[in-house]
A protein has these predicted regions:
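Extended alpha-helical, oligomerization-prone segments that build pores/tubes and scaffolds
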Residues: 1-184
Length: 184
């Protein structure tokens, strides 16, 4: 059943986009609950939209993501959100107003011998937590973060693009010098 659900989801498209980011060194895939038709929704997250942090065991345990949404989308993104009266009034008055949200997923280190993560959604303007959710069990982080290669203590991976960057710069400089000499 699991493979059927994944096969009928948008996994193939989104993992392809994540693999394109993996060329730089790190790919990120968000796994979200869907609906009855699509039980699982995947979303490739571009690397510039997140900040990753490692825990004491060198695993990526913390994901910080800035999102922008219209007021009328808040309850669709976070159905169990607790909005303050000020935010409710703002959303009623200006449903198209953009809200900046910091989404934080962090590993729960308080529970021994079990994995757990917590998701927090914070409105940046007022610094209020509008949504929080606990995830329990192995693989409970809703973000799948994968790296091409890394050295000890590094958060982000080193992909083939990073390794080829010096060769690309040298090639560009060589072409530039050839073109300059051709003009003489």
């Amino acid at each position: 059943y699991v493979f059927e659900v994944i096969q009928n989801s948008n996994f193939a498209q989104e993992v392809h986009e994540s693999f394109m980011d993996l060329a730089v060194g790190t790919g990120i895939l968000a796994v979200n609950e869907g609906d009855a038709v699509h039980p699982i929704q995947f979303n490739a997250i571009p690397l510039p939209h997140v900040v990753l942090d490692i825990g004491h065991d060198d695993n990526i345990d913390h994901v910080f993501r800035v999102r922008h949404a219209r007021c009328d989308q808040l309850m669709l993104m976070y159905p169990k959100a607790q909005l303050s009266e000020t935010l409710k009034k703002k959303c009623q008055k200006e449903p198209d107003a953009k809200i900046e949200i910091l989404e934080v997923v962090c590993k729960d280190y308080t529970v021994k011998n079990d994995d757990g993560s917590a998701l927090y959604a914070i409105v940046m303007e007022s610094k209020e937590v509008i949504f929080q959710e606990q995830y329990k069990g192995v693989g409970s982080n809703p973000y799948v973060c994968f790296r091409w290669a890394k050295c000890a203590g590094e958060v982000y991976g080193r992909g083939p693009l990073v390794n080829a960057l010096s060769a690309i710069k040298t090639t560009n400089l060589t072409i530039e010098l050839v073109l300059e000499n051709a003009q003489m």
